[in-house]
Regions:
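Hydrophobic or amphipathic, alpha-helical segments that drive membrane association/targeting
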Residues: 1-132
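Short helix/strand-bridging catalytic loops that position acidic/His residues to coordinate divalent metals
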Residues: 96, 155-156, 192-203
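Short helix/loop segments within enzyme catalytic domains
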Residues: 102-108, 112-121, 197-251, 277-281
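Catalytic zinc-binding patch centered on the HExxH motif and its immediate surroundings
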Residues: 129-146
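Short pre-active-site segment immediately N-terminal to the catalytic Zn-binding motif
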Residues: 152-168
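Active-site His/Glu-centered metal-binding helix of metallohydrolases
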Residues: 157, 170-178, 210, 214
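Catalytic Zn2+-binding segment of zinc metalloproteases
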Residues: 173-190, 220-223
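Pan-zinc metallopeptidase signature
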Residues: 249-286
Length: 286
């Protein structure tokens, strides 16, 4: 699957014939943010600041001490910092790490794409084995950024099932990093919005579309990788992406709409529709 004017890139190292991102000394491929991301981010930050101000005022009213009042939001930030640190520690302690000697073909893909996106530092990459989650993830702690790949991307023999699909999913997560979605202060500044039903989720969906824009800008031929989220590594080749994308337009119902408004990731049908028709932005709300 390729868009109009898509760049033809050299073969991905280790995968003859597959696309990869431009080298670090070449022009960085631009990718637009979803138009709803910036306004939703502003609203979410505003809501968080209002909640923080209300909390500070409540503590000051109860204690009469500005020291205690200031300590509460500082404690929230400190706890969140520690939670991120523990999540990162869990990956380091339990997960398989992609390296030049361990899944080297995946490592080369990550390095190439990170350079093409202009990242000054290549994120660490881990493989999540088992569990119910088929999605890949991007996160961070301190100055470190890391990606988590699902074992659904690998076959029983340990080889990558589909190099182009993996490259697209890696580019999606690197897009989160390039767009600043994994930063500590950005996440802290929007914590309050997560307490408002639908608000934090709407920002999260917009960020997912932004990450897809990055992935499509670098690996347009791998956009069919969205089928893996729907069918997993074993069934995705049998999924008709066009049929699923059409359902984003034809499926109706209040419960379905409510679901789309509350989830943090775009539904598979809406995401596939956005990837198939690049003339339209992904649907965040209606």
């Amino acid at each position: 699957m390729s868009g109009p004017g898509a760049d033809q890139r050299p073969a991905l190292p280790g995968y003859p014939g597959e696309p990869y991102a431009l080298d670090a000394d070449e022009e960085v491929v631009p990718a637009p943010a979803h138009p709803w991301e910036a306004p939703l981010l502003a609203v979410c930050v505003g809501v968080t600041l209002l909640m923080a101000a209300g909390l500070v005022h409540a503590v000051w009213s109860a204690t009469g001490s500005w020291v205690w009042a200031a300590a509460v939001p500082a404690a929230v930030a400190a706890v969140y910092w520690k939670v991120r640190g523990l999540l990162y520690a869990r990956r380091r302690a339990e997960s398989v790490k992609i390296s030049p000697t361990q899944f080297p073909e995946v490592y080369r893909t990550v390095v190439s794409l990170a350079a093409g996106m202009g990242l000054s530092r290549t994120p660490e990459v881990y493989v999540r084995v088992g569990g119910r989650h088929r999605e890949t993830d991007a996160a961070g702690h301190g100055l470190r950024r890391y990606l988590v790949l699902s074992d659904e991307l690998f076959g029983p023999d340990g080889r990558v099932r589909d190099p182009r699909a993996l490259a697209f999913l890696v580019a999606h997560q690197l897009g989160h990093v390039a767009a600043g979605h994994a930063g500590f202060w950005r996440r802290t500044a929007t914590l309050g919005a997560d307490l408002v039903p639908g608000l934090g989720a709407a920002l999260s969906r917009a960020m997912e579309y932004t990450a897809d824009n990055h992935a499509y800008a670098h690996v347009p031929e791998g956009a069919y990788a969205a089928r893996i989220t729907a069918g997993g590594g074993r069934l995705y080749t049998r999924i008709n992406m066009g049929e699923m994308a059409d359902r984003a337009r034809t499926d109706r119902g209040f419960s379905l709409l409510l679901y789309h408004l509350l989830v943090r990731r775009p539904g598979n049908t809406r995401r596939m529709a956005a990837l198939r028709d690049r003339t339209r932005r992904g649907r965040v709300f209606l």
